[in-house]
């Protein structure tokens, strides 16, 4: 206990179906602080988009690999039967529209009574019909990697999304009773007062369709496009982020200490702090978001389920 064993570089299997399912036997019996079980499940490893210039997951999770959606739905059904679990936290970094469509079909085909969430990008392929189907299958919460309301900043981050399309997608999800959590980044390289105001304008327009939002300060991670091309983005790396000492040797995570060319920063730029402060002053004039926007993941899922029950999809007749 307390010993770390290192046996060499980890090998990422190509065929995820060869991996055994996780064993939750010892956790499932009174091992949760939640009122009901919430279990993780995954369909893919790595990110199918894998182009965001700020994201460490492009390297940390390796290349994109996926499991058959039918196998994921079957695993969820087995946990429903064995552990009485109907709430599932999908840990995939990005569930693209094609995979969400197939997973929803598989869940509906099994007649599985479940609730789950996914993380996604606000692209137009998340059509109203797909979101309707996903809600019928049990999707009650989507975390959207929106990052910014400025098209210039989205292009600079290489998100592959459009501001106007994003607004349509978020509103369509809300129409189906799906809880929208927006993940925003403040202080990214290239941001300025105009970009910040564009973000505020977007949030004003989308606010009535949002249940929760994270306002994250930009973090420079190793092995990202931003860190590999600091001269291009006006950044200077000051060093790694030391988290602990192991047997007298420093251990660093992927976070890098940095400053912008025009700043005297001591490892973290004041730009992000200033933008977040401006946002905090701005949002007091907006209606308060539901409480579940400030809950941990498992509790957010339970709360989103309860909220969706009030607006269960099916109130409008439309083909899925």
Residue ranges and their predicted role:
Residues 66, 108-301:
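A structural motif corresponding to the C-terminal lobe/cap of the Radical SAM core domain
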Residues 55, 86-90, 142, 211-213:
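Hydrophobic residues within beta-strands of alpha/beta enzymes
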Residues 1-71:
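Acidic, low-complexity intrinsically disordered segments
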Residues 37, 84, 140:
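Exposed loop/turn and edge beta-strand positions of beta-sandwich/beta-sheet ligand-binding modules
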Residues 57-115, 128-129, 133-136, 175-176, ...:
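Conserved Radical SAM active-site core
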Residues 11-12, 44-48, 54, 59-60, ...:
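Short, glycine-/Ser/Thr-/acidic-enriched flexible segments
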Residues 40, 44-47, 72-80, 166-174:
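Structured alpha-helical segments in the cores of large, soluble enzyme domains
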Residues 293-320:
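C-terminal non-catalytic accessory extensions
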């Amino acid at each position: 206990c307390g010993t770390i064993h290192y046996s060499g570089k980890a090998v990422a299997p190509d065929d995820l179906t060869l991996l055994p399912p996780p064993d939750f036997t010892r956790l499932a019996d009174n091992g949760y602080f939640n009122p009901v079980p919430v279990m993780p499940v995954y369909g893919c490893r790595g990110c199918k988009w894998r182009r965001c210039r700020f994201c460490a997951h492009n390297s940390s999770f390796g290349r994109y690999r996926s499991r058959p959606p039918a196998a994921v739905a079957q695993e969820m059904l087995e946990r429903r039967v064995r552990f009485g679990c109907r709430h599932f936290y999908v840990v995939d970094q990005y569930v693209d529209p094609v995979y969400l469509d197939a997973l929803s079909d598989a869940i509906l085909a099994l007649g599985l009574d479940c609730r789950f969430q996914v993380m996604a990008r606000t692209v137009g392929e998340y059509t109203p019909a797909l979101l309707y189907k996903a809600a019928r299958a049990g999707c009650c919460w989507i975390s959207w990697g929106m990052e910014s309301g400025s098209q210039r900043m989205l292009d600079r981050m290489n998100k592959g999304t459009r501001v106007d399309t994003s607004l349509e997608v978020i509103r369509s999800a809300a129409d189906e009773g799906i809880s929208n959590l927006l993940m925003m980044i403040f202080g990214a390289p290239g941001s300025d007062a105009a970009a910040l105001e564009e973000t505020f304008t977007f949030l004003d327009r989308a606010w009535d369709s949002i249940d929760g939002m994270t306002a994250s300060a930009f973090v420079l991670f190793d092995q990202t496009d931003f860190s590999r091309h600091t001269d291009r983005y006006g950044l200077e790396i000051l060093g790694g982020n030391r988290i602990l000492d192991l047997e007298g040797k420093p251990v660093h995570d992927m976070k890098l200490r940095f400053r912008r060319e025009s700043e005297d920063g001591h490892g973290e730029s004041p730009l992000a702090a200033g933008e977040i402060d401006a946002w905090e002053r701005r949002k007091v004039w907006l209606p308060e978001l539901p409480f579940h926007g400030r809950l941990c993941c498992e509790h957010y899922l339970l709360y989103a389920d309860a909220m969706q029950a009030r607006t269960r999809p099916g109130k409008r007749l439309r083909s899925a």
